[in-house]
Amino acid sequence: MAGTGVFADVLDGEVYKYYADGEWRASASGKTVAIVNPTTRQTQYRVQACTQEEVNKVMDAAKVAQKSWARTPLWKRAELLHKAAAILKEHKTPIAESLVKEIAKPAKDAVSEVVRSGDLVSYTAEEGVRILGEGKLLVSDSFPGNERNKYCLSSKVPLGVVLAIPPFNYPVNLAVSKIGPALIAGNSLVLKPPTQGAVAALHMVHCFHLAGFPKGLISCVTGKGSEIGDFLTMHPGVNCISFTGGDTGIAISKKAGMVPLQMELGGKDACIVLEDADLDLVAANIVKGGFSYSGQRCTAVKVVLIMEAVADTVVEKVNAKLAKLKVGPPEDDSDITPVVTESSANFIEGLVMDAKEKGATFCQEYRREGNLIWPLLLDHVRPDMRIAWEEPFGPVLPVIRINSVEEGIHHCNASNFGLQGCVFTRDINKAIMISDAMESGTVQINSAPARGPDHFPFQGLKDSGIGSQGITNSINMMTKVKSTVINLPSPSYTMG
């Protein structure tokens, strides 16, 4: 159970503590932030409302701890990460329980997120040893006009203090995808979890604490964005920001100055369906891609662009599958669970009502109870409808009928987003050409968009992000190249 057993230190009465300098603390503010259960719409947990002064102390401790950590042998860093991964997986049940109650994640998916997170940390440890254990040697006579009298030795060194800000929908997995690379690379890390998902993140951080990482190396501060949000992202002690979320990331990027940024900011992932596609495969992937976790995924299918000739058939197949989805509370392993907040549900409803006023075809009756919205497919959506462009982050999916591939590509590329997309066709040549034409960070062929496997590159174009994620890319992003040049008194040549 959350906050009990090995996690008892995380809880102070009814309020979860924040983590600083190797210990769990109550904030001097005396204030708390409520976490509302999306299903019951009642306060489920409370976390500390940290102050700016507490953030300053966390940053000071992180800076000191990082200097020592950078001198820790690479194998030792990896060893501790493996230990944290094992502890995380061992205690998956209470963490998954928090995910169910904080963000209404279906129980089976909540457990999977924790296990996947442990696997990610272990892989990061192995990958870090591989890529950080290698250097590079350059010799001067490979560039015109130079003799062989200079040797350049280059290696990767840490950036310093990494600020990690994960989103509510994967508060554990998208936290460790930042924590693991930062730590193996020799950085310290300050985590600011989302409010919804903070308790699961705090439990995850305790697993790193139990693994024995040095004091001050990892910190986790909770609180109101209005109080510590900008203060964190603009803090002079931060040397790198890794953020996953929405429009807030654009604001951060404008304020971050010279700090390296890694950002994933959402998408309007397009699914282009050609006449020659396997229509059963298409329908299965539209349902999986568009409605898993109630559509609250950055890589969810968010608009279907389908050739008119096969549209009726696919819509019929999708509707048949939607009718079989289980709608209800996450504890029952429902397929469709409540969206995370009432404001999210209201936003989704606004998109639905706009589509209704403008003549979209409702394949199901629109139904909502509190934060719970039943799955809805909207056919005959036109570009003048908001849902054609805006990201609902809910179980509502628009279908736009097209008469040419070019029309589909044009709609995809007219979006200000460019995270992922997918194309369904049996013609691999067409698939590759369409992929090349789509302005998306990743294009899936004959499968719905997906973030994983976690070692694959993951990046967005346009307003969908800055930089690339994935384990290898994240490690490289959280380091900088350091070169040492050896100047010889005279040219050196190989034997012979």
Curated annotation (Swiss-Prot):
Domain of life: Eukaryota
Keyword Cell inner membrane: no
GO molecular function per UniProt: glyceraldehyde-3-phosphate dehydrogenase (NADP+) (non-phosphorylating) activity; lactaldehyde dehydrogenase (NAD+) activity
SUPFAM superfamilies to which the protein is assigned, alphabetical: ALDH-like (SSF53720)
Cellular compartment(s): Cytoplasm
Site annotation Transition state stabilizer: residues: N169
GO CC annotation terms, alphabetical: cytoplasm
EC number: 1.2.1.9
Chain sites annotated for binding NAD(+): G245, G246, D247, T248, G249
Protein residues bound to NADP(+): K192, T195, D230, E391
Classification via InterPro entries: Ald_DH/histidinol_DH, Ald_DH_C, Ald_DH_CS_CYS, Ald_DH_CS_GLU, Ald_DH_N, Aldehyde_DH_dom, ALDH-related_metabolic_enz
Gene3D superfamilies the record matches: Aldehyde Dehydrogenase, Chain A, domain 1 (3.40.605.10), Aldehyde Dehydrogenase, Chain A, domain 2 (3.40.309.10)
Top-level EC class: oxidoreductase
Modification Phosphoserine, positions: S404
Keyword rRNA processing: no
Keywords: Cytoplasm, NADP, Oxidoreductase, Phosphoprotein
Catalytic residues in the record: E264, C298
Residues engaged in binding substrate: R116, N169, Y170, R297, C298, T299, R451
Reaction(s) this enzyme catalyzes, per UniProt: D-glyceraldehyde 3-phosphate + NADP(+) + H2O = (2R)-3-phosphoglycerate + NADPH + 2 H(+)
Regulation: Insensitive to magnesium or calcium when dephosphorylated. When phosphorylated, 3-fold activation by magnesium or calcium, 2-fold activation by potassium, inhibited by ADP and AMP and insensitive to ATP or PPi.
Main subcellular localisation: cytoplasm
Modification comment: Phosphorylated in shoots and non-photosynthetic tissues, but not in leaves.
Function: Important as a means of generating NADPH for biosynthetic reactions.
Family: Belongs to the aldehyde dehydrogenase family.
Subunit structure of this chain's protein: Interacts with 14-3-3 protein when phosphorylated. This interaction is released by divalent cations.
UniProt name for this protein: NADP-dependent glyceraldehyde-3-phosphate dehydrogenase
The species this protein was found in: Triticum aestivum (Wheat)
Gene that encodes it: GAPN
